[in-house]
Structures are given as structure tokens and as C-alpha cells.
Amino acid sequence: MDSMNLIEKELYHVEKMIKGDVVKEKSIKEIYKYIFKSDGKKMRARLNLISSSINRKKKNRIKLAAIIELLHTATLVHDDVVDESSFRRGNESVNNIWSNAHGVLIGDYIYSKAFIYMVDVGKKE
């Protein structure tokens, strides 16, 4: 398998990690699914997977790529609130559909999910 196919396969697992394990609370779940409905290019995750292929375990490589995407997405959601943006990537922004408070809270939820993954990556085995 060539390295680009391997990266694509790993990106699938990154996406699965990001979209999985969402809180059962209906309103949070609805907004979270809305934010991650499109796959996007995942350039940050791609770069992480490529650069970390030298010395990282597969589990941590995928988790680190997911962390980067989650942190990036959380900053975009918060940025839309601060800038009072109506659209992000051609779609209505969270704060435009729901409210600024929803945007801040879901951004914080996404940050928290990333931090939980960070703690897991940092555990001594």
C-alpha cells in the first residue's frame, strides 16, 4: 500500500473518532453533527499523519490528528461568535442558526473533547 492510500485510510479513522462518542444530549448532538457534517480537506490532520509517520504508534497518530482537527474547529466556531459571522465554509454558522451562547458552548465542548484525547495520548504505558 502506498503512503497516500495509508494516509486516506487513517483519515477515515480520524473522521470516525471525531464523529463518534458524541454526548447524548439532543441539542448538543444536533449542533455537533451540523458542524462536522462535511468532511473538509483535513489538511492539518494530513500533515500531522505524514510528519508523525516516522515514530508514532498508529493509535496515537490518529488521535493526535483528531485533536488537531477538533482544536481547529473549536477556534473557528468561537471566531464566528466573536466576528458575528453568518457563514462558515459556505454554510450558516452555528451562532447564526442557534445563538452566540450555543456557539460558545459547543466550541467549549469541542475543546473539552480534544483535551480529553490529549490526556489519553500523554498517559504513560
Labelled PLM ranges:
Residues 1-73, 77, 81-96:
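Conserved N-terminal diphosphate/IPP-binding helix and adjacent helical/loop segment
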Residues 43-49, 107-115:
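Well-ordered alpha-helical segments within folded domains of soluble proteins
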Residues 83-87, 112, 124:
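A generic signature of intrinsically disordered, low-complexity regions enriched in glycine/proline
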Residues 88-112:
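Divalent-cation-assisted or electrostatically stabilized phosphate/pyrophosphate-binding catalytic cores
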Residues 116-125:
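Transmembrane helix-loop-helix
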